[in-house]
């Protein structure tokens, strides 16, 4: 499969984005998958426009966006993107939408059509902490996951799409003693495992990975 992997530039005052640093280290081939990497801006709509332009220019079987989730200690494949922008902080062009639908004619939510449970388990099997997440937030990460679902629903019915959040890396938490981090090499290992779990048949595993609350 041809898979497009995207990651955001640094945002929120950070000098680095672990998602971007991690995809730079991914190999160009993971199992049977040919990997293409794309940096996108942490900017509402402009980020998804850049992906849309790439999809117009080149065919891909799947798109996986990677983003930073400072405060999480594990890798978290996301189950669903919701149709709302509600930004607690401005994006990198000082946009701060509050309670604004991402697409007026879009569904309330789009579920990733990747085998997210299989991917989560593959990360764990590689020795990296992971959990299936049911919320991608309401900032640009959720925005991108939702926009990928919208693109699949309206333009590219055969494309697979998803999102994985990654923690801070250690250098980002030197002055944040209450925040967890993960070594960049571990993030890369986990992402490789997740991507490697994707197959042509797209079958997921039947296992309870949900949450009580």
From Swiss-Prot:
Record-linked CDD domains: Peptidase_C15
Pfam families: Peptidase_C15
Molecular function GO labels: pyroglutamyl-peptidase activity
Top-level division of the source organism's lineage: Bacteria
Active site: 78, 141, 165
Location within or outside the cell: Cytoplasm
Top EC class, one word: hydrolase
Catalytic reactions of this protein: Release of an N-terminal pyroglutamyl group from a polypeptide, the second amino acid generally not being Pro
Keywords: Cytoplasm, Hydrolase, Protease, Thiol protease
Enzyme Commission identifier(s): 3.4.19.3
GO cellular component: cytosol
GO biological process: proteolysis
Bilayer-crossing regions: none
Function: Removes 5-oxoproline from various penultimate amino acid residues except L-proline.
Similarity field: Belongs to the peptidase C15 family.
Quaternary state and interactors: Homotetramer.
Protein name: Pyrrolidone-carboxylate peptidase
Gene name in the database record: pcp
């Amino acid at each position: 499969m041809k898979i497009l992997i995207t990651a955001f530039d640094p945002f929120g005052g950070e000098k680095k984005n672990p998602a971007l640093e991690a995809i730079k280290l991914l190999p160009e081939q993971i199992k049977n998958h040919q990997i293409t990497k794309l940096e996108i801006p942490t900017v509402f709509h402009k980020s998804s426009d850049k992906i849309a332009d790439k999809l117009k220019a080149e065919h891909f079987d799947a798109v996986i966006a990677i983003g930073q989730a400072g405060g999480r200690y594990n890798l978290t494949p996301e189950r669903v993107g919701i149709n709302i922008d509600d930004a607690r902080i401005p994006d990198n062009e000082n946009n701060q939408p509050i309670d604004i639908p991402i697409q007026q004619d879009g569904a309330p939510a789009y579920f990733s059509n990747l085998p997210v449970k299989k991917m989560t388990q593959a990360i764990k099997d590689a020795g990296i902490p992971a959990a299936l997440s049911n919320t991608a937030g309401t900032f640009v990460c959720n925005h991108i996951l939702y926009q990928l679902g919208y693109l699949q629903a309206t333009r590219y019915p055969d494309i697979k799409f998803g999102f994985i959040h990654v923690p801070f890396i250690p250098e980002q938490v030197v002055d944040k003693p209450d925040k967890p981090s993960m070594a960049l090499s571990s993030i890369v290992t986990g992402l490789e495992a997740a991507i490697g779990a994707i197959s042509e048949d797209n079958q997921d595993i039947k296992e309870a990975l949900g949450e009580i609350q």
